[in-house]
Structures are given as structure tokens and as C-alpha cells.
Amino acid sequence: MATSVAPSPVPESSPLSHATEVLNLPNAYITQPHPIPAAPWETFRSKLSTKHTLCFALTLLLTLGGTISAGYAGYTGNWIICGIGLGIIVLTLILALLLAIPLKNKQTGTKLIDEISQDISSIGSGFVQRYGLMFSTIKSVHLPELTTQNQEKTRILNEIEAKKESIQNLELKITECQNKLAQKQPKRKSSQKSFMRSIKHLSKNPVILFDC
């Protein structure tokens, strides 16, 4: 007697049944991968570069026409039209320069913000290098010179103070000598008076000395 094993029923809510249902779905419900579109900024940038190129060419033609009209007006003596033509030339040149900036950025593959940041960084690095060189020069050259000058100044001031002290000592010695001389002068006067008296006395009473 053969026994047959019946397959176990799969519950409807199991993950396996959900996967089999997904596989049995028609192809209309399966999403196909779509290519990712290009960035809108790149499209706008390409269109903008085309417009700038066209405007740049028209600006150059306008500059050429203004130059011809201004030259002809100056040749005929109509200075008002000549001035208007010169003004148009200047304005179109400014406009051409403004239009040439994005064209240059498109050709070099850079942006204006990148160029400005590069300029700022280069200027900042240049300032840092210059100030670093200046500070290193001050540290290596000027500070030792200032130190030696300060030492020389201190030495000179010490010499001046020593000379002042020596001068004061000399002044004290001179005053002491003057005081001593002032004290000796009355004694000299008294000795001079006694000497003069003795001379007068000898003149009145001469003394005769005999040889032996």
C-alpha cells in the first residue's frame, strides 16, 4: 500500500506567496529603468553660451559700425554724430567685455566664482608671503640691530652718569681747596705785615756785620 505525501499548503500571507505573486504579474506592472536626464544647469549654460556668442558677434559689428559712422561724421564736421558714435563705441566695448567673461569661462572650463576665489586666495597667499618675509626680516635683521643699539645706548648713559659723578667729585674738591685757601689767606697777610715791620725796623736801625 503506497502512501502519497500531499504538499503542505502555503498561507496566503506568507512572504513566499507574495514573491510568487510578484513573479506571476504581467510585464505592464514591472518598471523599466529610465536614463537620468542631464542637469538643467548644464543645458542652461550651453544655451547661455550660444546666446552670449551671438550677442558678442553683434556687439562687435555694432562697434565696427559706430567706428565707421564716427569717423565719417568727424570727417564731414558733424561733431554731434561723432560724439554719439564714440559713446556707442565705448558702451559696446564695455558690453563686449562683459559678454566675453562667460565665453572665456566656457572655453577654459572654469566658473567666475572659481576664478574670483582663486584670485582672492592668490592675493591672500601673496600678502601672507610678503608679511611673512617682512616679519622674518624684522626678526633676523632689525631686532638684533635694535638690541645692539639699546646696549650701546645703555653703555653711553652709564658713561655719562660716571662722568657726572666724577665732575661732582671734582667740584667738591675744588670747593674744599677754595675753603682751605680762604682760611690760609689771613695768616699770609699777618706774616706779610710782620715782615714789612721788620724791614722798616732794619731800615731805621741798620745792623753792621763785621767779618771775622
Curated annotation (Swiss-Prot):
Localisation per UniProt entry:
Cell membrane
Its primary localisation, in coarse terms, equals: membrane
This protein's membrane topology, according to the annotation, is:
Multi-pass membrane protein
Q: Where are the transmembrane segments?
A: 54-74, 79-99
Keyword vocabulary terms for this entry: Cell membrane, Membrane, Transmembrane, Transmembrane helix
Gene Ontology cellular-component terms listed: plasma membrane
The lineage's top-level taxon is Bacteria
Protein's name according to its UniProt entry = Uncharacterized protein CPn_0440/CP_0313/CPj0440/CpB0456
